Design a protein with these regions (language model features):
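Short beta-strand edge/turn micro-motifs at domain boundaries
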Residues: 111-137
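Long C-terminal interaction/binding lobes of large macromolecular proteins
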Residues: 94-96, 107, 123-127, 142
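Short, low-complexity N-terminal intrinsically disordered segments enriched in polar/charged residues
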Residues: 1-39
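Surface-exposed, charged secondary-structure patches
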Residues: 73-109
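Cysteine-centered loop/knuckle micro-motif
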Residues: 18-20, 153-156
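Internal alpha/beta loop-helix hairpins
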Residues: 29-62
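Short Cys/His-rich zinc-binding micro-motifs
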Residues: 4-14, 138-149
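Short solvent-exposed beta->alpha transition segments
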Residues: 54-83
Length: 158
């Protein structure tokens, strides 16, 4: 299936080709912190570690290696993104979100209030405050927590 027919991984209900893919291909730049947050989430889902690393603030790029980002993206299955709030002014912005993913047999939620800055006329992720959320251990015959109403073994089981 080509990206032209896929819904975007960022849960925007738009086609990937019209939503985050142009950012990943660098044919467009995110105009808001929320667009960048969605593009980062989708980049993890498609294992585009270079985009994720390049979207960090310059001061944070060295501590976030492409290989570590790729390793994390490869062992996880990203399920959905919920943006709760976002805003920005000329040079700073924020996005409050919940990202859901599977890591092995755990259903995980990353709840974060992310901070963004503008560098060289581009939005970049600076850092964020993470709200701890307990992971859920999922058994093969449990209903998948992604909301599909299928058994986990028939849905997201690796």
């Amino acid at each position: 299936m080509t990206s032209n027919a896929l819904l975007c991984f960022c849960s925007s209900q738009q086609l990937y080709a019209d939503c985050c893919e142009p950012f990943h291909l660098k044919t467009k730049q995110p105009q808001t912190p929320e667009q960048l947050m969605r593009a980062r989430y989708s980049a993890y889902a498609v294992k585009n570690a270079v985009f994720v690393r390049d979207s960090y603030a310059k001061e944070k790029q060295a501590e976030n290696s492409i290989s570590e980002i790729k390793d994390f993206a490869t062992i996880c299955c990203f399920v959905n993104l919920t943006v709760l709030d976002s805003g920005y002014d000329e040079d700073t912005g924020f996005v409050k979100f919940k990202a859901h993913y599977f890591y092995q047999d755990l259903y995980c939620e990353l709840a974060e209030h992310s901070k963004f800055i503008k560098e060289d006329e581009q939005w970049r992720y600076l850092d964020g405050e993470i709200t701890p959320v307990a992971d859920i251990k999922v058994k093969r015959n449990d209903t998948c927590p992604c909301g599909s109403n299928k058994k986990y073994k028939k849905c997201h089981s690796v």
